[in-house]
């Protein structure tokens, strides 16, 4: 069943579903309870793939050669790597670097998303609305806000059906350059499988500035859609402040989405966190995925240590100008 951290009542304050496929969502919601135990916590906190420059770099020293970035990240993560059956994958990107590269650890390893997939669901919904030349309806916006800000699972059920479930998600992923993400079976959106690198690609599609935010710009999220997702990720409820936000500079704004799921077969936890943080004036996109954690608390501690190490490695070349 869903974890107890999702304190918002599924339907409280929301209108009755008026979206395509909502007739099935009530039945689907009950089935989804047996498949995923997902939630999120937050507020305003491969081989590396070459990415186009998103804007002028902030003052700093030259970035390390791209072939060394993965090795630098692996070295930084060494002290925090889990033991036993716990698995970890991390990816990080300096959005304001002149020579952008995704540095990754655990390349190609897939994890179940839990509630971080809610960002992908919203991205797919917005792409479909763009294609239809319309804005989101009042109901869609209410569901989107509940799904991202409070990680409401019923809202995710409704919007998962609205986008066409795994097929609709897959179409959006292709447009946004996510190559290793596969939608969960049936109504099991929380069982979608993804990689840390793909999640940074999705974050780049949201947070990069200008038309280069998408691998295929004419077909990606437009400026209004990116701003909307970023706003919701930056206004997650205060009680949900954990995960990659721990890696940001004190007092800086951040945006994130977390997810967790306890597997009924093993009792072990999947703990994931994705988002944007700012350090030394640079914006970093961070994705930390983990599985096989003995408890939710242990998983959160691991994710936060990994996020700090990843941003530390990525920001080692950045130094503020002397005053």
Regions found by a protein language model. Name each.
Residues 94-102, 121:
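Short, glycine-anchored, charge-dense loop/turn motifs used at functional sites
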Residues 2, 39-88, 93-97, 161-323:
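Penicillin-recognizing serine hydrolase domain
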Residues 110-134, 147, 286:
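Active-site SXXK
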Residues 99-107, 254:
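Amphipathic coiled-coil signal-relay and dimerization helices
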Residues 34-37:
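C-terminal motif of bacterial Sec signal peptides marking the signal peptidase cleavage site
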Residues 105-111, 185-188:
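A short glycine/serine-rich beta->alpha loop
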Residues 2-29:
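N-terminal export and membrane-targeting signals
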Residues 129-179, 195:
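Conserved catalytic neighborhood of penicillin-recognizing serine enzymes
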């Amino acid at each position: 069943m869903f974890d107890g951290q999702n304190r918002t009542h599924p339907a409280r304050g929301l209108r009755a579903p008026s979206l395509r496929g909502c007739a099935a969502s009530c039945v689907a919601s009950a089935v989804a309870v047996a498949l995923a135990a997902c939630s999120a916590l937050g507020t305003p906190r491969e081989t590396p793939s070459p990415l186009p420059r998103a804007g002028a770099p902030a003052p700093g020293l030259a970035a390390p050669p791209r072939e060394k970035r993965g090795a630098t990240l692996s070295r930084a993560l060494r002290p925090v790597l889990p033991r036993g059956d716990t698995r970890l994958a991390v990816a990080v990107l300096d959005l304001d670097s002149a020579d952008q590269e995704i540095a990754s650890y655990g390349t190609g390893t897939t994890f179940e998303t839990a509630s971080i997939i809610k960002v992908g669901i919203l991205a797919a919904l917005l792409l479909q609305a763009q294609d239809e030349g319309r804005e989101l309806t009042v109901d869609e916006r209410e569901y989107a806000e509940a799904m991202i800000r409070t990680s409401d699972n019923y809202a995710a059920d409704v919007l998962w059906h609205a986008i066409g479930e795994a097929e609709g998600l897959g179409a959006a992923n292709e447009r946004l350059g996510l190559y290793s993400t596969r939608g969960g079976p049936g109504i099991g959106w929380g069982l979608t499988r993804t990689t840390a690198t793909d999640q940074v690609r999705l974050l780049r599609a949201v947070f990069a500035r200008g038309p280069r935010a998408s691998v295929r710009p004419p077909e990606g999220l437009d400026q209004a859609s990116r701003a909307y997702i970023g706003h919701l990720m930056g206004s997650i409820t205060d009680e949900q402040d954990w995960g990659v936000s721990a890696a940001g500079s004190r007092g800086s704004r951040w945006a994130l989405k977390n997810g967790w799921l306890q597997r009924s077969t093993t009792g072990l936890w999947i703990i994931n966190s994705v988002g944007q943080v700012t350090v030394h004036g640079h914006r970093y996109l961070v994705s930390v995925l983990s599985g096989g954690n003995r408890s939710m608390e242990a998983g959160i501690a691991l994710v936060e240590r990994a996020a700090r190490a990843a941003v530390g490695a990525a920001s080692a070349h950045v130094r503020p100008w002397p005053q």
